[in-house]
From Swiss-Prot:
Modifications after synthesis and translation: Dually phosphorylated on Thr-171 and Tyr-173, which activates the enzyme.
Molecular function, one GO term: ATP binding
Name of this protein: Mitogen-activated protein kinase hog1
Keyword annotations of the record: Activator, ATP-binding, Cytoplasm, Kinase, Nucleotide-binding, Nucleus, Phosphoprotein, Serine/threonine-protein kinase, Transcription, Transcription regulation, Transferase
Record-listed Phosphothreonine modification sites: 171
Gene for this chain: hog1
Natural source organism: Aspergillus clavatus (strain ATCC 1007 / CBS 513.65 / DSM 816 / NCTC 3887 / NRRL 1 / QM 1276 / 107)
Positions that bind ATP: 26-34, 49
Activity regulation comment: Activated by tyrosine and threonine phosphorylation.
Length: 365
């Protein structure tokens, strides 16, 4: 049984195993607080993410289970990796990952990026996406604050809590507005890996310009700003809109012509503009894929087809349509944690763990 230590961070109780010391807050998200810490076992700095009340509702339980399964499955140099996971006596879940010094949002607000950094960061984002997409996963919430970077300029994509299966029937608004693909705004349903390419294009443009490309004040304004630059969506894209209200809105907009991006990005490398043109395309089917983008001339200094791996197997989404009670998600979560720590689930300890789920008395680190 692990020994747990409590600390107050921003009024939130962090209850972590004694393996981790020197807690310092580094970020707050909608679903959890992240602290830096030192791993006593390895001597390395780590990030500890507390998932708030993971078992309070079936929806939150499923979301936490999904993020855990994804972090366990996705193993790639440009994806954040899970080094530890545990459930505290208070039944909060903690994910422990490597700690990177900053994120792209902080970098972009501090200074303009030089060309070689823009190239290298974009290359690593696309290299990570090639792997993620090959696993049958769509991130859905790519934005500069989800792109972590260390002092060596190594880049890792994080926060897979919103990620979903590649599925023609996806729903809802999920990504931060500035980076949201038009098909999410227009259809609310049918979208796929291409939404991540659009988001990456918006991030790429922000690296080139030093400010967001489409800073919409709301959803309507967001779409209007997009059409000012990229023109009115083609008819075949408009025909895919499912919502009658959205369809009326789009048809009410004045007809606009697409502006050459070279006019907006006057100081950018022509190859950079060409790649951006291929990423920011209304029709998802005509948008460049991660694999194709990696082979683009702009990324030739870094492109190496022998070192841009795909996933060995697809992610198992069989749980995703399940509508289960909290206690069942809890049992599944504990099972995943036991598996992560290579604990035999047939032994007496794991039996005791399962029996004690309702009371939250059994905890493994």
């Amino acid at each position: 049984m692990a020994e747990f230590v409590r600390a107050q961070i921003f009024g939130t109780t962090f209850e972590i195993t004694s393996r981790y010391t020197d807690l310092q807050p580094v970020g707050m998200g909608a679903f959890g607080l992240v602290c830096s810490a030192r791993d006593q076992l390895t001597g390395q700095p780590v990030a500890v993410k507390k998932i708030m009340k993971p078992f309070s509702t079936p929806v939150l339980s499923k979301r936490t289970y999904r993020e855990l399964k994804l972090l366990k499955h996705l193993r790639h140099e440009n994806i954040i990796s899970l080094s530890d996971i545990f459930i505290s006596p208070l039944e909060d879940i903690y994910f422990v990952t490597e700690l990177l010094g900053t994120d792209l949002h902080r970098l972009l607000t501090s200074r303009p990026l030089e060309k070689q950094f823009i190239q290298y960061f974009l290359y690593q984002i696309l290299r990570g996406l090639k792997y993620v997409h090959s696993a049958g996963v769509v991130h859905r919430d790519l934005k500069p604050s989800n792109i972590l970077i260390n002092e060596n300029c190594d880049l890792k994509i994080c926060d897979f809590g919103l990620a979903r299966i590649q599925d023609p029937q996806m729903t809802g608004y999920v990504s931060t507005r500035y980076y949201r693909a038009p098909e999410i705004m227009l259809t609310w349903q049918k979208y796929d890996v291409e939404v991540d390419i659009w988001s990456t294009g918006c991030i790429f443009a922000e690296m080139l310009e030093g400010k967001p490309l489409f800073p919409g004040k709301d959803h309507v304004n967001q779409f209007s700003i997009i059409t000012e630059l990229l023109g009115t969506p083609p008819d075949d894209v408009i025909q895919t809109i499912c919502s009658e209200n959205t369809l009326r809105f789009v048809k009410s907009l004045p007809k606009r012509e697409r502006q050459p991006l070279a006019n907006k990005f006057k100081n950018a490398d022509p190859d950079a503009v060409d790649l951006l043109e291929r990423m920011l395309v209304f029709d998802p089917k005509k948008r460049i894929r991660a694999t194709e983008a990696l082979a683009h001339e702009y990324l030739s200094p870094y492109h190496d087809p022998t070192d841009e791996p795909e996933a060995e197997e697809k992610f198992d989404w069989s749980f995703n349509d399940a509508d289960l009670p909290v206690d069942t998600w809890k049992i599944m979560m504990y099972s995943e944690i036991l598996d992560f720590h290579n604990i035999d689930q047939g032994n007496d300890a794991s039996q005791a763990l399962a029996e004690g789920l309702g009371q939250g008395q059994q905890n493994f680190a």
